[in-house]
Regions:
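ATP/NTP-dependent adenylation/nucleotidyl-transfer catalytic domains that generate, transfer
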Residues: 1-14, 24, 28-33, 37-41, ...
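Active-site glycine-rich loop that binds ribose-phosphate moieties when present
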Residues: 16-19
């Protein structure tokens, strides 16, 4: 069982990779493609994705949108309020930790840090 591995981060990344292979099987079975959900903050701002996991997609239609823009898009499309306001999580951990727990900052703080180098959050982000 995967739960016997000691490296929890490795286990979470394995789950993302298994999810990706499942999505590719479903897509292939339906003559489809895998559409990414990564946004500007996650993918390009802080690199919050699993290589060969949730980063392994055919197209990334919202890659240039901030998380705030994605939420606004959802509202304009009539997506349920409960979905838009749900705390973001990658769903890879058994303890239900949120993106904010893992990143140490909210998406609002990350967006401000990406846009304004003088913001308080900018110094908290480890820029490569």
């Amino acid at each position: 069982s995967l739960s016997n591995f000691k490296n929890n981060h490795g286990l979470a990344n394995s789950r993302a990779r298994l999810r990706m292979t499942t999505l590719y099987q479903v897509a292939a079975s339906n003559n489809g493609i895998v559409v990414g959900t990564g946004n500007k903050v996650e993918d390009f701002g802080v690199g919050f994705y699993t290589k060969y996991g949730d980063g392994g997609v055919d197209i990334s239609p919202i890659a240039d949108c901030t998380k705030t823009q994605v939420w606004e898009m959802g509202k304009s499309l009539g997506i349920m309020k409960e979905i838009i306001e749900a705390e973001p999580t990658d769903g890879l951990w058994d303890d239900g930790r949120t993106d904010t727990n893992q990143l140490g900052m909210s998406y609002d703080e990350l967006e401000k840090a990406m846009m304004d180098k003088t913001s308080e959050g900018y110094s908290k982000v480890s820029w490569n």
